[in-house]
Amino acid sequence: LLQEVVRALRRAGGVTGPRYCAGTHIHISAEDYTPQQIRNLVNIFASKENFLWDALQVSSARESYCHKMDKQFIENINRKKPKDMEEIKKLWYRGRMSEQFQHYSNSRYVICNLHSFFQHGHYEIRAYNGSLHAGEVRSQIVLALAISNAAVTKKYCSPHVSQSDNMRYSFRVWLLNLGLIGEEFKNCRAHLLKHLEGDIAWRHPEDGIAARARLKEKRELEKQAAREQRNEPVSDNSTQAENVPEENNEPTESQCDGVEEELEMSM
C-alpha cells in the first residue's frame, strides 16, 4: 500500500527532497505514554542525534526547521525526573505556558517535537528528508516505530551522547538493538546505513583486516593439505596387491552383454 501511494505521488508529478527544503514528518500517538516513557523518548534522540544527523543526511537548508534537542531541557528533565505531564510541559516551554496554544511555537522545530504531543497527543519526528522512494519512506517509518517501542518497553534510556570512530558499525549495532534484525528489515538497514562510512562488520577495522588475513591463511593451509593428500605416494605392498589378479575374476553378465552388442555393431 505504501509503495502504491508513493508511486501515485510520482505519477501525479510530485517532487520533494532537500533541494526543495522539504522533509518527511512522522507523527506517532503517545496518548498512553507515561512521564518516564516521554523521558526515555527524548533521551533516545538526545543520545543518538549525532548518529541520526549523519545517517539521515539532515539537509543544512532544513536545519532552521529541525534543531537538535534542547540541551537545557534534556538536563532539566533528567535532573528533576518529573512524575506528571504538566511538569514536563513546564520544562518544555520553559515556563512560557501560553506557547502551548500557539500552532507555530518555536519549541516545535526540533528533531523530536513534543509541542504537537501537548496539543494533539502525538509527537513528531522532523529529521527525515523528503523522499519519493518507497523503500526510503518505509525505512523512515520503521525507524520511528522502533524508537517509539524502545521508549515504551525499556526501563530507562540514558541521555549520554553516543560517539564512535566507526559510525557505520555503531549505528548498525544500535539498529539491531532496536529490533531491526533479520531478512524482514534488511532493506531498512541498507537505506539507513548507506550514507555512513566505516567497516560494517568490525568495531575496529584493523581487527577485520587481521581476521580476514587469518581466514585466508587457514584456507591456504587447508588447500595445501588437500593437495598433499592427493599426491601421497602409494606403498609397494598396496601396488603389488592391486596388480595381482583376483581368483574368479570373470566378467559379469552385464559386462558380457555390452561386449556382445559392440561385436554385433562392428560386424
Go through the PLM ranges and name each one.
Residues Y20-T24, I28:
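Short, conserved phosphate-binding/catalytic loop or strand-edge motifs used
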Residues L1-P18, E31-M267:
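C-terminal accessory/tail domains of diverse enzymes
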